[in-house]
Amino acid sequence: MATSQRKILVTSALPYANGPIHLGHMLEYIQTDIWSRYQKLRGHECHYICADDAHGTPIMLKAQQLGMAPEEMIAQVNKEHQQDFADFNIAFDNYHSTHSEENRVLASDIYLKLRANGYIKSKSISQLFDPEKSMFLPDRFVKGTCPKCKSPDQYGDNCDACGATYSPTELINPKSAVSGATPVMKDTEHFFFDLPAFEDMLKEWTRSGALQTEMANKLDEWFEQGLQQWDITRDAPYFGFEIPDAPGKYFYVWLDAPIGYMGSFKNLCDKRPELSFDEFWAKDSKAEVYHFIGKDIVYFHSLFWPAMLHGSGYRQPNSVYAHGYVTVNGAKMSKSKGTFIKARTYLDHLDPEYLRYYYAAKLSSRIDDLDLNLEDFAQRVNSDLVGKLVNLASRTAGFITKRFDGKLAKIADTTLTDAFLAKQEQIAEFYETREYGKAMREIMALADIANGFVADAAPWQLVKQDDQQEAAHQVCSNALNLFRILVTYLKPVLPRLALDVEAFFQQTLTWDSLGQDMAGHEIAPFKAMMQRVELDKVNAMVADSKENLQATSEPEAPKGPLASDPISDTINYEDFAKIDLRIARIVKAEHVAEADKLLKLQLDIGGETRQVFAGIKSAYSPEDLEGKLTVMVANLAPRKMRFGMSEGMVLAAGPGGSDLWILEPHEGAQPGMRVK
């Protein structure tokens, strides 16, 4: 048991109840599940809560298309979601729905408290109305050109291209996404949440350590733009909760969706009387609350949600952790290429433990996107899990069973065991801080050591010699004990494998038993625990995910960066070959006091340090850059500037200002390597 037991409530974002779970979704649930399982492994009281996000016009219209009542459709989707999660070994303590009595009561309670405290404003607004369907158009059912960056085909609440938020009436050339008709303006009374009233509180909270630095920096941009009152109303027809004292008016889905965390926990408390709802959600709560989310919903979880909680007398979350998107083979998930892979399609072909490990091996505490490279996926799983981890037991367990009555020897030389146990606090810290990739690398480095030990000792040779039986017993027992420690470290990531290993050792793997003396312990006969990833199964999964898209008669007009910034004139290879691109590590980054756009970087290029001034100040804080790998032009003539000598150039992509991203090589690249 942990020396000081924590009380923790952890959530993943609620999946929308109008479609299946895909591998992009699964990143978040795997990330959260690993963290929750780790906390439980350490002996903490941890409750992992989730629910389906089951309200809104999209669900109402989808149900109409299917000829079903919305309640019937969301119940069916909820069942499918829960089955997918269960088969991926996602261990929710409770999975509910926002379309529940608990959520209705809590949403009304929070709204009425906000209204009583003066944070709800009422005013008449002009809203877009579909004249063909005779309905007001919610923001996600209007499309047009973004009023900020002018990107086309954007929804009516926020722009996917630049991240700006706005009202549907601000769109340029709006169209109804329901009928395609041009909307007309019509007056209606709406209720607004007074978000600007919480600006000081939010500025303090967002810089309190509750958010990742990247998130806090992004929120600063929104503070600079000025917070706006938030429309929490939708007009009938709408599938959701009716607002108290306002017939025909409904809560916008983003009001009751995060309250769904509370609703699901209340549902769990009703099932388990020993749990106290107020112990976790009251304003003076000493329990911990953590939300894991995707970077696309930062605005709602980091501004609206804590403000709503504060204004209605509830506690705020300790932290909100955001992650990036999933790409497949270096590109956005694609139905035509078969890389838009549903969770169920994956499960039809491959072991969920494979994906859990691969995602863990690539996850960090940052908000970087994660690429699921299917070839690398197969190679890494086969190398790490089959070739290193399970192989350690398969090479030694048989000797224990056949020659030593299935019992482990008392290990005379504990040098390796001590070295493995010495890593537990470092691995624990990596799990706690969501640096799963670092934890996996640490664990696999230990697996390499263990396999090297077995290879050098060669127990298959020792057992053939009468005078080396005790040595063989020692080697195999030592190897299996190291295997037990490794699988205990990996238990949050590979829960099914951990169960198999527990059956093999005939004991539960716990963090507190890592250093247990296994002398005389009897093991069960070894059974195969994990199969290699076969590429034909990966290819079959991709084939099953493909959708044939009808070819268009005319080529699509260019979109995105190429439309405004076309490719330059062709150059000869000789011209390109003159440019010497090198991997560089940013050793130090600091502000340049006299410059609005520049940061001063000290770059290690493998045996040499360069000073470079880079115009990326609007996009990065110095602390975000230190330790990163990037790419620099190493043979650019030094340039004397007012602030000092610039000895090269770092490469970045984007239109400029805050929309710049430095190039970051994949892991394995080292300072000084040439980029070819």
Curated annotation (Swiss-Prot):
GO terms for biological process: methionyl-tRNA aminoacylation. Binds 1 zinc ion per subunit. It is found in: Cytoplasm. The keyword Protein biosynthesis applies. It comes from Shewanella sp. (strain MR-7). One of its GO terms (molecular function) is tRNA binding. InterPro entries: aa-tRNA-synth_I_CS, Anticodon_Met, Met-tRNA-synth_bsu_C, Met-tRNA_ligase_1, Met-tRNA_synth, Methionyl/Leucyl_tRNA_Synth, MetRS_core, MetRS_Zn. Residues 575-676 form the tRNA-binding domain. Zn(2+) binds at C146, C149, C159, C162. A motif ('KMSKS' region) lies at residues 332-336. It is an enzyme of class 6 (ligase). It comes from the Bacteria. ATP binds at K335. Its cofactor is Zn(2+). Keywords: Aminoacyl-tRNA synthetase, ATP-binding, Cytoplasm, Ligase, Metal-binding, Nucleotide-binding, Protein biosynthesis, RNA-binding, tRNA-binding, Zinc. It holds the Pfam family tRNA_bind. GO terms for cellular component: cytosol. Belongs to the class-I aminoacyl-tRNA synthetase family. MetG type 1 subfamily. It catalyses: tRNA(Met) + L-methionine + ATP = L-methionyl-tRNA(Met) + AMP + diphosphate. A motif ('HIGH' region) lies at residues 15-25. Homodimer. PANTHER family: METHIONINE--TRNA LIGASE, METHIONINE--TRNA LIGASE, CYTOPLASMIC. This is Methionine--tRNA ligase. Its EC number is 6.1.1.10. Is required not only for elongation of protein synthesis but also for the initiation of all mRNA translation through initiator tRNA(fMet) aminoacylation.
